[in-house]
Amino acid sequence: MPININKFILDMERFDGTLKKYPEDFIVEEITPEGTVLEVGKEIGFEDVEKWHGSFIHFTVEKTNWNTMDALKQIVRATKTKRKNFGFAGTKDKFAVTTQRFGCFGLKKEQLENINIKDIVIRDVQKTNKKLRMGGLWGNKFTIKIRDLNLSEKEIKRISDLKLDYVLNYYGIQRFGLIRPITHIVGKFIYERDFESAFYTYCGTPINETGDSLEARQLVDMGEFKKALKLFNRGHDYEKRLIQQYLKYKDFKMAFTALPPQLNSMFVNAYQAYLFNEMINKRFDYGFDELEGDILEDNTPTGTLIGYDTKFSGGIQGEIEKEIVERENLDLKKFKIEDFGNFYGTRRKMVTPIYDFKSRFENEIFELSFKLERGNYATIVTREFTGNLS
């Protein structure tokens, strides 16, 4: 089951290169709703809210080779504060240098002062009365280096002259799984209420794996759950939770209650994203200028993330959306899934602008810098040049 990322904006011969050779090759700096870039290595100096009632603390976390959730676990442990008190505006990947705002209810500035976690820096601590919620950012600034290029002067000149103003608004590989792109497959099984297949797909089905991890997944596929548990390591906490819960209740649906609700929602969201990516592919030949019947956002045609409350476009775009629903044999009411959530469906722009795009070659390194609104993927931009998603 592919992830439906097939089309390109740039008409060019793409080049091979190494992305993310070092974490410093992929810098992600969060941009606040007010437009402030949380620059790496820079103190911003956010002012405390004047009439502060002691509710929330916000702070910037700069981290190298940490994803958001793992960094948060360490900060929770260091501050001896409950996980549920924390929030963040957006998630960041691991193999990168990233900045982002965290928020916490009832935390004191002093609790952050003596934190010593390798490759994590905390600064810009601010007292405020507002809770930091998911989506509470404008977007991100990316500075990306692609290494190990072997290009002629002519090729360098050709690529340097390219200008990229917008990109297809695909959901990137991160939504489906960098190593094992199966999140959307699990989501489809959950939508179909086939929890047994969802379980085996997530815990079994080895892809791009070796050693104990490969053997553990093979054991799951054979039904040898207890043996598999002994081989899954610390990086497979969710697989272990699922298996332990299944062994306790002998119920595949019940097994998924051992996972965080956000993760269970993410499975179905990934299936919606997979279908959305296909809409982009089918719309591509018609172009992305406004057509009769389009539903627009910022004067840009949108596609639907299919859910129980989906409102279809008219015209050609509506035909595309309905064709996918019919082919997948979808019953929209079934997107209300007990114990997993109500997936009402929304709309998303099919192309998205790129802001402040710059590129340069230096010492056989191609460096890109640009800004994207929240929810958009930098790897979709780099793919326009390299053809690769990771």
From Swiss-Prot:
The record's section on Gene3D superfamilies has: TruD, catalytic domain (3.30.2350.20)
Task: Quote the catalytic residue positions.
Answer: 93
Under Enzyme Commission nomenclature, its number is 5.4.99.27
Choose any GO biological process term that the UniProt entry carries and state it.
tRNA pseudouridine synthesis
One MF term in the entry's GO annotations: RNA binding
Family matches, as Pfam families: TruD
Q: Which UniProt keywords apply?
A: Isomerase, tRNA processing
Keyword tRNA processing annotated:
yes
Q: Which reaction does it catalyse?
A: uridine(13) in tRNA = pseudouridine(13) in tRNA
Per UniProt, residues of the TRUD domain are 166-353
Checking NCBIfam families in the record gives:
tRNA_TruD_broad (TIGR00094)
Family, similarity comment: Belongs to the pseudouridine synthase TruD family.
What role does this protein play? Could be responsible for synthesis of pseudouridine from uracil-13 in transfer RNAs.
Q: What protein does this entry describe? A: Probable tRNA pseudouridine synthase D 2
Species of origin reads Methanococcus maripaludis (strain DSM 14266 / JCM 13030 / NBRC 101832 / S2 / LL)
Give the gene that encodes this protein. truD2
